[in-house]
From Swiss-Prot:
Name of the protein: Putative glycosyltransferase TagX
Alphabetical list of Gene3D superfamilies matching this protein: Spore Coat Polysaccharide Biosynthesis Protein SpsA, Chain A
InterPro entries for this protein: Glyco_trans_2-like, Glycosyltransf_2, Nucleotide-diphossugar_trans
GO molecular function terms listed in the Swiss-Prot or TrEMBL record: glycosyltransferase activity
EC number(s) on file: 2.4.-.-
Taxonomic lineage from the root: Bacteria, Bacillati, Bacillota, Bacilli, Bacillales
Keywords: Cell shape, Cell wall biogenesis/degradation, Glycosyltransferase, Teichoic acid biosynthesis, Transferase
GO BP: any one term: teichoic acid biosynthetic process
Pfam families documented for this protein: Glycos_transf_2
SUPFAM superfamilies membership: Nucleotide-diphospho-sugar transferases (SSF53448)
PANTHER family cross-referenced by the UniProt entry: GLYCOSYLTRANSFERASE, GLYCOSYLTRANSFERASE TAGX-RELATED
Family: Belongs to the glycosyltransferase 2 family.
Organism: Staphylococcus aureus (strain NCTC 8325 / PS 47)
CDD domains: Glyco_tranf_GTA_type (cd00761)
């Protein structure tokens, strides 16, 4: 078996060496490092490792996004001799392959001609110990499934821990998206796959530090707009209600609400721009399936973290909620009730300690 590992890099000097030396397999493999324009020591590090280790190739691009780098790697697979790659992986430069685990994927892939994808578990670094990511807990044993049979796969919108048939190199990441560029390509691959082999082993560990894409107003606006765009696109791709609910749950709860919490903790003063953006998101949810609890969690995030409400901004918020069937009192009554709710919440939190 022959397979290719694509690693998109850009200023990853802190982690790239650890990843490259962690890759080992009994199969014939090659590593394509596609750099998007690093200005640190990433490229010199890769070049030094090329002299120490076999299989590493480096392609340098300028001002290229992660999606562009991955697409370059996929194009390379398509353009080379078909016998050079039976399969491929894409691994983040902040990840590491856990010892002896890569061949768990390759063994499963070789075991059955109908296997088009092999998916293992992902881990995160918790105080020096690898812990299973909660989104991967549904992989409890080794088994063969399809997306229809296992819609939980839609909670795993990451390349890490996945081995793809080389025929999926024809697919492309969305270069117009900075953060969710891989959602559509992953869904298409899952839908096209004849069979998907699940491996109940932690394959890849993630050393990434969560820097958040929502640290300032401009980034937050761009990020939320992107989430709305990809959410609508993928929801239109999914035919079964259960699939749409699982995907929307992941996007609404993890991507949107978690980012909203982070942003509002950094910028608690409620502004017209923030409320308008949340309104746009809530209204976009109405055009597709969603978990109702996620709607209430988003509302709680805005009301519990938000500060410095004024009458005009509150009225915009109140009318938004009325449009989706949720009543809110007048401005003064809202402030009184909110103060009471926050006090009760703090008291409950103190009693739990």
């Amino acid at each position: 078996m022959r397979f290719t590992i694509i690693i998109p890099t850009c200023n990853n000097e802190a982690t790239i060496r650890q990843l490259l030396i962690s890759i080992e397999s009994k199969e014939h493999y090659r590593i394509l490092c596609i750099d998007g324009g690093s200005t640190d020591q990433t490229i010199p590090m890769i070049e030094r490792l090329q002299r120490e280790l076999k299989h590493i190739s480096l392609i340098q691009l300028q001002n290229a996004s992660i999606a562009t780098c991955i697409n370059k790697g996929l194009m390379d697979i398509k353009m080379t001799d078909p016998h050079d790659s039976d399969a491929f992986m894409v691994i983040k430069p902040t990840s590491i392959v856990l010892p002896g685990k890569l061949d768990r994927l390759t063994a499963a892939f070789k075991n059955n001609d109908n296997i088009d994808m092999v998916i293992g578990q992902r881990a995160y670094n918790y105080h020096g110990e690898w812990k299973l990511k909660s989104a991967d807990e549904f992989i409890k044993d080794n088994r063969i499934v399809t997306l229809t049979e296992q819609p939980d796969l839609l909670s795993m919108m990451s390349f890490d821990g996945k081995l793809f048939s080389a025929k999926f190199a024809e697919l492309q990441c969305d270069e117009t998206l900075a953060n969710t560029y891989n959602h559509a390509i992953l869904v298409k691959a899952m839908q096209k796959a004849t069979d998907i082999h699940l491996v109940s082993q932690m394959i890849v560990g993630d050393n990434d530090i969560d820097t958040h894409a929502t640290s300032n107003d401009e980034d937050f606006n761009r990020y939320i707009t992107e989430i709305m765009k990809i959410r609508q696109r993928v929801m239109e791709m999914l035919l079964l209600p259960e699939q749409r609910l699982l995907y929307s749950d992941m996007v609404d709860r993890i991507l949107f609400n978690n980012s909203l919490k982070y942003y509002m903790n950094e910028h608690p003063a409620v502004t017209h721009t923030t409320i308008q953006l949340v309104k746009d998101y809530i209204m976009s949810m109405q055009h597709s399936d969603y978990v109702s609890q996620n709607m209430f969690d988003i509302i709680n995030t805005v009301e519990f973290i938000g500060e410095n409400w004024d009458r005009e901004i509150y009225e915009l918020w109140r009318q938004t909620l009325i449009q989706v069937g949720i009543n809110r009192p007048t401005y003064k009554k809202f402030l009184i009730q909110l103060k009471g709710r926050k006090f009760a919440h703090r008291t409950k939190s103190m009693l739990k300690r």
